[in-house]
């Protein structure tokens, strides 16, 4: 395609103006209803050590979508389309890699659908209902540094601070969300049958593991920020997000990083092995000890750490891949997980787009070997995953990137919202237990929906 938008847009030196620090969500509520497209990427404290920055963006310069071999550029006034054999190769035309450290300094913010894996590996996946990717090019926004307590307006193109300043002091009440369950894509019986089919493939030696998911669709009306407000209250995570790009919105509380690139250091935190939280700290400890002595969970985690090491090794300098943290317990509101930390250093000639492609999709939402596991998932689940199990985050103009795995999320298109969760299937999996794991992972989302409003007939206004 050969598009270079920075031949059209004048990229200025970074402008930074300090603002009074307020809670990111309170600021976002003031901005959300004023713009058709906006985002909040919010880090909230947990014992993972990942919470660092939060970002708000609004009304991007353009939105870039890829679907069916075509890239569409929508600047709000007009749309252009270009044929593209591999849209991720062409995505670099919307980035200007600058040598400048420090998180996000303007760039692409959006999501990548699970179906986009076919551009990174030789695999056949069906077309989804969502674009393969959808990013806004955001050249200004608000940055919150939770370590220093600083808040700043940052800009690389123009100055829209006067436009939003009148909004920033507003106290905006949250509305309510009306919802109605429309359909569950898989019954409990069908999900357990899928587990048995996957175990048969494992016994035949095709794979070691496959992550099978179940989804439920809801009809929605009202204030979707009410759902996010409830979710951040009961399930704070290092990766909280509310992304609105026109008619598509993704709201989530992901515990798991897909990949981060900062100053050419690449890292990921594979999570595998799950138990519910206890009612007390002592009960938490007992449950965690049981988790760390479960041979099935440990074998699954080791497999996924090895997969992460291999993925990162594809784009890292020889000998630079390390595992500085291995099989530690990390706790969230409703569940606790086994977590490890895998790092590497990007080798010369590689960038954040290469790093993203090397690890996408995460082994923790696909399986091992990854390609064959994904083919089996496609045949068993029967419907495209779309944004679920893909990635959401940013590619910064300075070459940095930070993406969460799109799990523990509600994915909305129009009036429909979908909640989806999965479990890793191995040779000794018990179908009933795997089904319950999916339910445990979705519990915080369902509770958030209940807190945000009430079950109604959304078409009865």
Curated annotation (Swiss-Prot):
Instruction: Give the reactions, separated by semicolons, that this protein catalyses.
Output: chorismate + L-glutamine = anthranilate + pyruvate + L-glutamate + H(+)
Q: Please give the SUPFAM superfamilies that the UniProt record associates with this protein.
A: ADC synthase
Question: What cofactor requirement does the entry state?
Answer: Mg(2+)
Q: How is its activity regulated?
A: Feedback inhibited by tryptophan.
Work out whether the entry's keyword set contains Lyase.
yes
Gene Ontology molecular function: anthranilate synthase activity; metal ion binding
Q: In which pathway does it act?
A: Amino-acid biosynthesis; L-tryptophan biosynthesis; L-tryptophan from chorismate: step 1/5
Q: What is its EC number?
A: 4.1.3.27
Q: How is the cofactor bound?
A: Binds 1 Mg(2+) ion per subunit.
Binding residues annotated for Mg(2+), in chain numbering: 300, 437
What biological processes does GO assign it? Answer: L-tryptophan biosynthetic process
Q: Which residues bind L-tryptophan?
A: 43, 238-240
In terms of Gene3D superfamilies, this protein maps to:
Anthranilate synthase (3.60.120.10)
Q: Which Pfam families match?
A: Anth_synt_I_N (PF04715), Chorismate_bind (PF00425)
UniProt keyword terms in alphabetical order:
Amino-acid biosynthesis, Aromatic amino acid biosynthesis, Lyase, Magnesium, Metal-binding, Tryptophan biosynthesis
Q: Any idea which positions bind chorismate?
A: 273-274, 388, 408, 422-424
Nucleus as a keyword of this entry, yes or no, is no
Q: What class of enzyme is it?
A: lyase
Q: What does this protein do?
A: Part of a heterotetrameric complex that catalyzes the two-step biosynthesis of anthranilate, an intermediate in the biosynthesis of L-tryptophan. In the first step, the glutamine-binding beta subunit (TrpG) of anthranilate synthase (AS) provides the glutamine amidotransferase activity which generates ammonia as a substrate that, along with chorismate, is used in the second step, catalyzed by the large alpha subunit of AS (TrpE) to produce anthranilate. In the absence of TrpG, TrpE can synthesize anthranilate directly from chorismate and high concentrations of ammonia.
Q: Which protein family is it in?
A: Belongs to the anthranilate synthase component I family.
Q: How does it assemble?
A: Heterotetramer consisting of two non-identical subunits: a beta subunit (TrpG) and a large alpha subunit (TrpE).
Name listed for the protein in its UniProt record: Anthranilate synthase component 1
Native source species:
Methanothermobacter marburgensis (strain ATCC BAA-927 / DSM 2133 / JCM 14651 / NBRC 100331 / OCM 82 / Marburg)
């Amino acid at each position: 395609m050969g598009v270079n938008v920075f031949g059209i847009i004048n990229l200025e030196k970074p402008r930074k103006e300090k603002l009074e620090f307020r809670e990111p969500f309170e600021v976002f509520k003031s901005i959300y209803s004023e713009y058709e497209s906006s985002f909040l990427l919010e880090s909230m404290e947990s014992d993972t050590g990942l919470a660092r920055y939060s970002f708000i963006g609004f009304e991007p310069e353009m939105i870039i979508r890829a679907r069916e071999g075509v890239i569409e550029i929508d600047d709000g006034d007009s749309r252009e389309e270009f044929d593209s054999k591999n849209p991720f190769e062409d995505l670099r035309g919307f980035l200007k890699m600058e040598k400048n450290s420090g998180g996000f300094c303007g760039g692409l913010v959006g999501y990548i659908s699970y179906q986009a894996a076919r551009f990174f590996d030789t695999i056949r996946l069906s077309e989804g209902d969502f674009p393969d990717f959808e990013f806004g090019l955001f050249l200004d926004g608000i940055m919150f540094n939770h370590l220093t307590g600083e808040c700043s307006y940052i800009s690389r193109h123009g100055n829209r601070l006067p436009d939003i300043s009148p909004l920033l002091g507003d106290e905006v009440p949250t509305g309510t969300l009306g919802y109605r369950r429309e359909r569950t894509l898989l019954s409990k019986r069908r999900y357990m049958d899928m587990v048995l089919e996957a175990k048969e493939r494992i016994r035949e030696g095709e794979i070691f593991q496959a992550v099978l998911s179940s989804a439920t669709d809801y009809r929605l009306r009202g204030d979707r920020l009410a759902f996010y407000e409830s979710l951040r209250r009961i399930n704070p995570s290092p990766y909280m997000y509310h992304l609105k790009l026109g008619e598509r919105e993704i709201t989530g509380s992901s515990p798991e990083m897909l990949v981060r690139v900062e100053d050419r250091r690449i890292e990921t935190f594979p999570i595998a092995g799950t138990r519910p939280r206890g009612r007390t700290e002592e009960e938490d400890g007992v449950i965690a000890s049981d988790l760390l002595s479960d041979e099935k969970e440990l074998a699954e985690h080791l497999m996924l750490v090895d997969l992460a090491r291999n993925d990162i090794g594809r784009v890292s300098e020889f000998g630079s891949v390390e595992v500085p943290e291995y099989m530690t317990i990390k706790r969230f509101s409703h569940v606790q997980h086994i977590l490890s930390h895998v790092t590497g250093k990007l080798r010369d000639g590689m960038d954040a787009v290469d790093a993203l492609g090397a690890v996408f999709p995460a082994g923790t939402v696909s399986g091992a070997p990854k390609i064959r596991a994904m083919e089996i998932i496609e045949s068993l689940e029967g419907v495209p995953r779309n944004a679920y199990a893909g990635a959401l985050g940013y590619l910064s103009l300075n070459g940095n990137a930070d993406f969460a795995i799109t799990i523990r999320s509600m994915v909305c298109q129009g009036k429909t919202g979908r909640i989806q969760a999965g479990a890793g299937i191995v040779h000794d999996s018990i179908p009933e237990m795997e089904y319950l794991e999916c339910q445990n992972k979705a519990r915080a989302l369902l509770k958030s929906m209940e807190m945000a409003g009430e079950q109604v007939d959304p078409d009865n206004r």
